């Protein structure tokens, strides 16, 4: 299955994406808001989760490619992990290679993923969350017509320490 936009192709993540995922997750600027770069094993585990989520739930993060087949990153809706502070939910997220920033790709890809989540997957709500000091992601959330939902803001402990998430939700 492939989702297409005017400039992008979104496809299921696959084994062949391991090298590109590792490069994406190793970039310090890309990973600044996520506790820093991931090593290869951590990056591979993330890809494995996306592949497994698609097989189990029918939705997950999509690999993003330009029309020439160049890997730009990923975007899509994931089911929450069982122990998430917000309980069960579907969360949209994205991460792009550094040289893909500033071209509107995150908004374009996430918009296609949201449409798929509501139409094909029949989800009724999708949320997003980001750090308070990540205005780029907050701007994407606003362009996706998500609304701030401060009553659901949360804190969680991750490998990198305590993380405070600002929540946005679909209208």
What residue ranges belong to the model's regions?
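Acyl-donor (CoA/ACP) binding surface of acyl/acetyltransferases
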Residues: 1-33, 61-171
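Conserved GNAT-fold acetyl-CoA-binding loop/helix
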Residues: 29-49, 60
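A short helix-loop-beta-strand connector motif used in the catalytic cores of GNAT acetyltransferases and
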Residues: 51-63
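An amphipathic alpha-helix signature
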Residues: 15-22, 40, 44-48, 55
